[in-house]
Regions:
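Surface-exposed acidic, glycine-flexible loop patches that form ligand/cofactor-binding
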Residues: 25-28, 75-79, 144
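Solvent-exposed loop/turn segments at secondary-structure junctions
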Residues: 41-45, 91-94, 116-118
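Loop/turn elements at helix/coil->beta-strand transitions in domains of secreted/extracellular proteins
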Residues: 30-35, 79-85, 115
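Metal-dependent active-site segment of extracytoplasmic phospho-/sulfohydrolases and closely related
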Residues: 59-103, 110, 136
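Soluble non-cytosolic domains of exported or imported proteins
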Residues: 10-17, 54-64, 123-130, 147
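Active-site-proximal alpha/beta segments of enzymes that process anionic O-linked groups
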Residues: 1-30, 132, 138, 152-156
């Protein structure tokens, strides 16, 4: 869940619920300044049933419930007004694979919301996995190493 706290989930069948419960507890008790919650899904479904399939979209719908619970935990912890939330993925995909050179495989979804983030703005630029670290570094006020190829999309901020 965070650099100072690791949590191993008990397999795919129980993982989303167990991870969500652990995240809720951690958020409410610790009020973390930085937290990464990495669900196994929809990645597993994308690789077994295919990306852009009814099963994939059903899994996204299920995950929406877990995301809502996490958002409620942030509110309950009293840190909502100071929080920036990023939802993203580690890759795009075609059929059941990824790793190719097409934009559908390399681009990632990137949703950002929260403190000082413009509401209702669509990011027009392509977002790649390596841009995520650059965005987080920018949010935290950290200097980006020159060797990084990622870039923060500063236009999302007020």
């Amino acid at each position: 869940l965070a650099m100072s706290y690791q949590y191993q989930t008990p397999g795919y069948a129980k993982a989303p619920t167990a991870l969500c419960e652990a995240a809720e507890k951690y958020i409410i008790e610790k009020k973390p300044e930085l937290l990464a919650i990495c669900f196994e899904e929809p990645d597993h479904t994308g690789h077994t049933k295919g990306h852009d399939t009814p099963a994939y979209y059903q899994m996204l719908k299920e995950l929406d419930g877990y995301v809502e619970r996490i958002l409620q935990a942030i509110k309950k912890a009293g840190i909502w007004d100071d929080t920036i939330i990023i939802m993203t993925a580690d890759h795009g995909g075609i059929k059941t694979g990824h790793g190719g050179k097409t934009l559908r495989e390399m681009e990632i979804p990137f949703i950002i919301s929260g403190k000082n983030v413009r509401k209702g703005m669509e990011i027009k630029e392509s977002m790649m996995q390596y841009d995520t670290a650059a965005m987080i570094a920018y949010i935290l006020g950290l200097k980006q190493p020159q060797s990084w190829i990622g870039r923060p999309v500063k236009t999302v901020f007020k």
